Swiss-Prot record:
SUPFAM superfamilies: 4-helical cytokines. This is Somatotropin. It is found in: Secreted. It holds the Pfam family Hormone_1. InterPro entries: 4_helix_cytokine-like_core, Somatotropin, Somatotropin/Prolactin, Somatotropin_CS. One of its GO terms (molecular function) is hormone activity. Plays an important role in growth control. Its major role in stimulating body growth is to stimulate the liver and other tissues to secrete IGF1. It stimulates both the differentiation and proliferation of myoblasts. It also stimulates amino acid uptake and protein synthesis in muscle and other tissues. One of its GO terms (cellular component) is extracellular space. Zn(2+) binds at H45, E198. The modification Phosphoserine is found at S131. Belongs to the somatotropin/prolactin family. The lineage of its organism: Eukaryota, Metazoa, Chordata, Craniata, Vertebrata. CDD domains: somatotropin_like (cd10285). GO terms for biological process: animal organ development; growth hormone receptor signaling pathway; positive regulation of receptor signaling pathway via JAK-STAT; response to nutrient levels. It comes from Felis catus (Cat).
Length: 216
């Protein structure tokens, strides 16, 4: 392996292991670039985990002939579709960093309850062999986004919560067709919401710190 890619992998692993600053002023401030790098890496990891789990669940439980029709029916299922959040990179670029951070936080917080039931659904899953840690990973990303908000907010009052609903918990009765469809829909929303959060964070990072990886 060439030195460049190997060093990049080692740097990414090191950043994932870094803790977030707990209180502003308690410890030397982490550079804003590092806060963004940490948040983006965590969001990418969670989005990939969600995408892999969705595909694995689909292969295991959803007949191939039914997938397209079910996916179309899921289009209006996600609670996050009811908030005025950007739907893609171009729309995200029209919003301020503080707005994007608030939307990211709302998306992450809406899953903190449901994912606590995820390990019961995927007890034998190859992807979710460590599924009991998904909640901790989401909490870690939540803390990172909150750290960025503390750095970027100018002291103006925060806007009210836009999304007060959370998602239903995952159903552990996998012998029920209704439960399978419910879990399939939830996993689809989980994947979509984490993709949005990752996109928002990458847009913010790229426009603040111009870099070659901004094309996505």
């Amino acid at each position: 392996m060439a030195a460049g890619p190997r060093n990049s992998v080692l740097l990414a692993f090191a950043l994932l292991c870094l803790p977030w600053p707990q209180e502003v002023g308690t410890f030397p401030a982490m550079p804003l670039s590092s806060l963004f790098a940490n948040a983006v890496l965590r969001a990418q990891h969670l989005h990939q985990l969600a995408a892999d789990t969705y595909k694995e669940f689909e292969r295991a439980y959803i007949p191939e002939g039914q997938r397209y029709s079910i996916q179309n029916a899921q289009a209006a299922f996600c609670f996050s579709e009811t908030i005025p959040a950007p739907t893609g990179k171009d729309e995200a670029q029209q919003r301020s960093d503080v707005e994007l951070l608030r939307f990211s936080l709302l998306l992450i917080q809406s899953w903190l309850g449901p994912v606590q039931f995820l390990s019961r659904v995927f007890t034998n899953s190859l992807v979710f062999g460590t599924s009991d840690r998904v909640y901790e990973k989401l909490k870690d990303l939540e803390e990172g986004i909150q750290a960025l908000m503390r750095e970027l907010e100018d002291g103006s009052p925060r806007g009210g919560q836009i999304l007060k609903q959370t998602y239903d918990k995952f159903d552990t009765n996998l012998r029920s067709d209704d439960a399978l469809l419910k879990n399939y829909g939830l996993l689809s929303c989980f994947k979509k919401d984490l993709h949005k959060a990752e996109t928002y964070l990458r847009v913010m990072k790229c426009r603040r710190f111009v870099e070659s990886s901004c094309a996505f």
